[in-house]
Amino acid sequence: MLQEHFFLSEDVITLAQQLLGHKLITTHEGLITSGYIVETEAYRGPDDKACHAYNYRKTQRNRAMYLKGGSAYLYRCYGMHHLLNVVTGPEDIPHAVLIRAILPDQGKELMIQRRQWRDKPPHLLTNGPGKVCQALGISLENNRQRLNTPALYISKEKISGTLTATARIGIDYAQEYRDVPWRFLLSPEDSGKVLS
């Protein structure tokens, strides 16, 4: 698994790119599911108006962002979808990387079951942050958890591919930060890793 020092960089933009291709792994009730990270978004706490911790705002919900890098920040979006963020940087520097999409690897049948996705397009199984959490069995119970236990971790194992940067999604309120290219996507080189 990735060691703690990997997550302690204060450059969340670069780290959001470096996470692409790494395998995200969960163990829930003894069952393993995993997928390669293929889409991320960077949120740079103090100055980023799209970030929950803009201007060092601290709330009950976003307290996990102030933990040391390598912690999980989970929150609920629209009251129903759980979203996983990887906290980065030193303690009290509220940077995070949102995991937006994965390519399923281990436990794909279990992911389909969790998502109730039988006989539906496979490329839509884990192509959104809420879908990732549902497929991997990630919930608010994982909030503040260190990403170095069998329950939830990121492996050193990595696939390569072509990286694309675009504006982040759903942040029209973020003024001058609305269009910064801090959303990163990986198109894997191995065609066998691409969902059809």
From Swiss-Prot:
Its EC number is 3.2.2.-. The keyword DNA damage applies. Pfam families: Pur_DNA_glyco. The keyword Hydrolase applies. Keywords: DNA damage, DNA repair, Hydrolase. Gene3D superfamilies: Methylpurine-DNA glycosylase (MPG). One of its GO terms (biological process) is base-excision repair. It comes from the Bacteria. InterPro entries: Formyl_transferase-like_C_sf, MPG, MPG_sf. HAMAP family: 3MGH. Belongs to the DNA glycosylase MPG family. This is Putative 3-methyladenine DNA glycosylase.
